[in-house]
């Protein structure tokens, strides 16, 4: 699939520039991923690497933005819940004020989904939150308030924080979606070479396939005459 590296890079840059639109960009990726799973897989791999870098550098603003994107990809079922649960375990393993703040923000975004798809693991995460709250852990009062507000939000079944806004629930059938399962600690290749233009030696054949696929996705009818014209054009170009 041509341009998938560029598309992923553009989506990640747009999300970083405007995290408030994370759910909108995730909805776009969900639709694209349902037709081209390799794009969703590539984006998710790059996102995992970005999360690792932000965590290792203790870059809270970057981490807050990136985990928000991941949360909405989990909500859209582009990503499985494994990465989300591993992320929370990593953030809360040795809690600090910053990691607790990021964890709370993440759960607010995708808590409704995690509660639905993995209730037992989600209960364990909240046991960890309560343990941190009761032990104090020398956390700032603000962080303790964040945890308490999260517990209250859970009791209300995440009222005001739906997994997917009705306007962004675009896929007609959940079975259309392809969910990617990977670990936060997997060895990952971001395939940065895909961001660079390379000549396609079979451009004409691939362009014809692309046109047919585009018509199918957009619901355009392809007549036999159009197919014959495409074949004739290919033969003329090759000749």
Predicted regions and their residues:
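Conserved P-loop NTPase catalytic core
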Residues: 168-172
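Structured beta-strand/turn binding interfaces of compact recognition modules in eukaryotic regulators
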Residues: 150
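Eukaryotic alpha-helical solenoid repeat scaffolds
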Residues: 1-145, 153-164, 174-180, 189-190, ...
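Extended alpha-helical domain cores of large, multidomain eukaryotic proteins
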Residues: 177-239
């Amino acid at each position: 699939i041509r341009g998938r590296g560029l598309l992923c890079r553009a989506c990640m840059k747009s999300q970083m520039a405007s995290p408030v639109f994370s759910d909108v960009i995730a909805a776009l990726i969900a639709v694209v991923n349902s037709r081209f799973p390799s794009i969703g897989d590539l984006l998710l791999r790059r996102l995992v690497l970005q999360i690792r870098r932000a965590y290792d550098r203790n870059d809270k603003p970057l981490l807050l933005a990136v985990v928000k994107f991941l949360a909405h990809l989990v909500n859209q079922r582009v990503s499985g819940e494994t990465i989300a649960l591993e992320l929370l375990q990593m953030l809360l393993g040795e809690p600090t004020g910053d990691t607790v703040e990021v964890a709370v923000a993440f759960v607010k975004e995708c808590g409704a989904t995690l509660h639905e798809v993995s209730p037992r693991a989600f209960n364990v995460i909240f046991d960890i939150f309560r343990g941190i709250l009761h032990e104090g852990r020398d956390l700032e009062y603000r962080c303790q308030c964040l945890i308490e507000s999260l517990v209250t939000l859970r009791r209300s079944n995440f009222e005001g924080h739906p997994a997917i806004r009705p306007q962004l629930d675009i896929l007609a059938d959940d079975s259309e979606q392809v969910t990617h399962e990977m670990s936060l600690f997997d060895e990952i290749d971001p395939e940065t070479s895909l961001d660079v233009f390379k000549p396609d030696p079979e451009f004409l054949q691939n362009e014809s396939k692309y046109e047919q696929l585009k018509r199918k996705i957009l619901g355009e009818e392809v007549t036999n005459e159009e197919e014959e014209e495409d074949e004739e054009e290919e033969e003329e170009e090759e000749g």
